[in-house]
From Swiss-Prot:
Residues given in the record as substrate binding sites: S74, N75, S195, G219
Assembly notes: Homotetramer.
Organism, scientific name: Danio rerio
GO biological process, one term: glyoxylate catabolic process
Site positions for Involved in proton transfer during cleavage: Y165
Family: Belongs to the DapA family.
GO cellular-component term (any): mitochondrion
Keyword Cell wall biogenesis/degradation: no
Annotated protein name in UniProt: 4-hydroxy-2-oxoglutarate aldolase, mitochondrial
Amino acid sequence: MFAHRSFSLLCRRSAVTSWRSQSHTAGKRLDISGIYPPIATPFTEPEDVDYQKLDDNIRKYGRLPFRGLVVQGSNGEYPYLTAEERVEVVKRVKQALPKDKLVMAGSGCESTRATIQMSQRMADAGADCVLVVTPCFYRGRMDSRALINHYSKVADSCSVPVVLYSVPANTGLDLPVDAVIQLSKHPNIVGLKDSGGDITRIALMVQKTRSQDFQVLAGSAGFLMAAYAVGAVGGVCALANVLGQQVCELAQLCVSGRWDEAKELQYRLIEPNTAVTRGFGVPALKLAMDWFGYHGGICRSPLQPLSKADLEALRGKFSSNGWL
């Protein structure tokens, strides 16, 4: 049986009594364990941000046992939003979300300077921590030295804790393990969201950072059980936008050591999860949200709606696993 950290609550914050030893104004140790949906951004037909529908979604998510929400992650279509829109969305989410839930705001930009500025704007907008994706346009030069320098400068400057974000499917770049190990020692870097799905890599990072106050989150519901088994403490899962209660249930089963039950539920989540992530992407996630009573709707161009064939394939992934 894998060694596993015990937690007292399903997806909610555990009591935090220690202080992180650091010189930064962020100061306080932040426990990020639990489940987070990386929320979508609703748009009107002219492709303006629909803040009323956003508020409706947040109020529904607020009733589920999430640890918090990730705002302006990949599923929020942040590359297609202006800087002002990104910040305003975070403000609206913070206002609508229950106070006991975290707002983890995506603040990554291509330059270190812009990332520092956006991170502070997100903190000022109410974010409890920032999620910083790897800069990737010049990915051939983004070696460990460059990335350690980038994240260290961001964390040095930010007034809230920083969470590293590795999403190679979108960036073409895996945050190197040696860089993660080095960055885990920074007093204002509290964890990592890893969306690559390499469980050996996740296990190695958990093992190598155990002496630090550092937490690893799975970046997908598709490998959530496996990530928990090797020491991850939660997940940022696109599928939780649609099947939030079920993803939280899977987390609870893992935390409780009920691995046989967890395995059966994990099986039923794999195909729907793949469909709304690598299979058909954000347009599929938003369509599935519509099916399950949330506001998904259209994407901002150039993302296009699913074809009829893809729509039927998406429906099949949910129905064949008993969700529709």
